[in-house]
């Protein structure tokens, strides 16, 4: 029997927005259709946070940051939060907190998104996107790096 592989409690958040409209891309989770969020994911063993951010963007919304010569912005912000109780089974026993690094990805324009891990996507004005997410860290990242940066 294989040992269970647990998620690392180290993750990234990538707020994707369109430079021309300042609207934010929000993704509807499969495991909780009432939960909308930006791109998120775990940092894998041996991977840096920026590498994880680029990988997750490519996996979740099929945008290749390198091939498209886009600039992934490291917000230089890391937060720690309590892992939702219904998600703790994914982590090693006793792990209750996660450390998340924030990034932004500015696309020139809104585009059709090919999503692979979510039910749907929406482009929303930044205040509406911030209000939609259940994640305080996602809300704060949108407010700080899209709304207040405008």
Swiss-Prot record:
Keyword Transferase listed: no
Domain Nudix hydrolase as annotated: residue spans: 5-146
Residues where Mg(2+) binds: 56, 60, 117
Record family assignment: Belongs to the Nudix hydrolase family.
pH dependence: Optimum pH is 8.5-9.
GO biological process: folic acid biosynthetic process; tetrahydrofolate biosynthetic process
Co-factor: note: Binds 1 Mg(2+) ion per subunit.
NCBIfam families: PRK09438.1
Keywords: Folate biosynthesis, Hydrolase, Magnesium, Metal-binding
Superkingdom of origin: Bacteria
EC category name: hydrolase
GO molecular function: dATP diphosphatase activity; dihydroneopterin triphosphate pyrophosphohydrolase activity; magnesium ion binding; metal ion binding
Primary role: Catalyzes the hydrolysis of dihydroneopterin triphosphate to dihydroneopterin monophosphate and pyrophosphate. Required for efficient folate biosynthesis. Can also hydrolyze nucleoside triphosphates with a preference for dATP.
Record-linked PANTHER family: BIS(5'-NUCLEOSYL)-TETRAPHOSPHATASE [ASYMMETRICAL] (PTHR21340:SF0), DIADENOSINE 5,5-P1,P4-TETRAPHOSPHATE PYROPHOSPHOHYDROLASE MUTT (PTHR21340)
CDD domains linked: NUDIX_DHNTPase_like
Organism of origin: Escherichia coli (strain K12)
This enzyme's EC code(s): 3.6.1.67
Entries under Pfam families matching the protein: NUDIX
Binding site for substrate: 7, 29, 40, 81-84, 135
Documented activity regulation: Subject to product inhibition by pyrophosphate.
Reaction catalysis annotation: 7,8-dihydroneopterin 3'-triphosphate + H2O = 7,8-dihydroneopterin 3'-phosphate + diphosphate + H(+)
Protein's name according to its UniProt entry: Dihydroneopterin triphosphate diphosphatase
Nudix box (motif): residue ranges: 41-62
Cofactor: Mg(2+)
Entry-linked InterPro entries: DHNTPase (IPR003564), NUDIX_hydrolase-like_dom_sf (IPR015797), NUDIX_hydrolase_CS (IPR020084), NUDIX_hydrolase_dom (IPR000086), Nudix_hydrolase_domain (IPR051325)
């Amino acid at each position: 029997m294989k040992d269970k592989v647990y998620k690392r409690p180290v993750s990234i958040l990538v707020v994707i927005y369109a430079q021309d409209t300042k609207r934010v891309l929000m993704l509807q989770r499969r495991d909780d259709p009432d939960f909308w969020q930006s791109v998120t994911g775990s940092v894998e063993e041996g991977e840096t946070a920026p590498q994880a951010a680029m990988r997750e963007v490519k996996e979740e919304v099929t945008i290749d940051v390198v091939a498209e010569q886009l600039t992934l912005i490291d917000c230089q912000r890391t937060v720690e939060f309590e892992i939702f109780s219904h998600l703790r089974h994914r982590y090693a026993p006793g792990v209750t907190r996660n450390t998340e690094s924030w990034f932004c990805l500015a696309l020139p324009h809104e585009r059709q998104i090919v999503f692979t891990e979510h039910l749907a996507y929406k482009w929303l004005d930044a205040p509406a996107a911030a209000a939609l997410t259940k994640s305080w860290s996602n809300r704060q990242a949108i407010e700080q790096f899209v709304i207040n940066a405008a």
